[in-house]
Amino acid sequence: MLYSLARPMLFSLAPERAHELTLSMLKTAHKMGMLRQTIQPKPVTCMGIEFPNPVGLAAGLDKNGAYIDALAGLGFGFIEIGTITPRPQSGNPKPRLFRIPEAKAIINRMGFNNEGVDQLVENVKAAKFRGILGINIGKNADTPVENAVDDYLICLEKVYNYASYITVNISSPNTKNLRSLQSGDALTELLETLKKRQLELAEQYHHYVPLVLKVAPDLTHEDIQFISEQLLTFKIDGLIVTNTTLSREGVENLPFGNEAGGLSGAPVFEKSTECLRSFAKVLNDQIPLIGVGGITQGEHAVAKKDAGASLVQIYSGLIYTGPDLIKECVSAIT
């Protein structure tokens, strides 16, 4: 595809600039009617939703929902936008995004840079896309972690009518103390409060929107056991496994390999897939799983499915392989 020709030029730019330029080029191509990648339908029913195919876009590429229609032209079975926070925030200081091409890896410490939930809602309302849209929600960096539930409630209420499902992101390593919400009373309070509000909104709008949790790969067996118990207790609708890792296995001696932030791409594949397998074993098909982390070829998508995933998501693999990866993954999954 054309991406193989454009990639050397994009990789000559700073990663964040290349990210912005790629999205801009996609939007232009879409407006010109040049984005029509045909993907063979492979319907999957998950969380009460019928997905046209099981391969989705992970959150982080389109944080503000400004490129939904263009991304839809690539043939994803579903698109997840965000992470969004109640108020706009600029994120962490630049540089904060690093390519490690030798390992097909990326390190980011973006810090939930976004234009705020109100702008995202306006962008979603303006989009023509009528497919499956996930909206990923988080907390503002300056909100104390003990008040985090308030930020999640604000976002939940504002995006509820515009999302096919809503992802609660408590696993980014780039917002101080965010991962502490994955354990103990903090997780219990968060899930209990959000589930209660979800059910109230479902009754108010006569429309049920599934609630999904996104977790990190850096979890112990005890963590996995506890999180699983909480998911079942509060009847959370799905689990995304996993976010980026703090591990540097596979990139230790490479340029930028020791930059702070979350590592994604090929090196996280084994770790995230093992985490997925562990959750699948504990949950025993009681909650659907979405596998993400290190998918750079079709066989990786199959491995996620074999480990227990009903759906998969890709992001970093797209940067190295291009949109052909979507079709490859859909074709590989039987």
Curated annotation (Swiss-Prot):
SUPFAM superfamilies associated with the record: FMN-linked oxidoreductases (SSF51395)
GO biological process: 'de novo' pyrimidine nucleobase biosynthetic process; 'de novo' UMP biosynthetic process
Enzyme class: oxidoreductase
EC number: 1.3.5.2
Recorded coiled-coil stretches: none
Membrane-protein topology: Peripheral membrane protein
Comment on bound cofactor: Binds 1 FMN per subunit.
Name the UniProt record assigns to this protein: Dihydroorotate dehydrogenase (quinone)
Organism: Acinetobacter baylyi (strain ATCC 33305 / BD413 / ADP1)
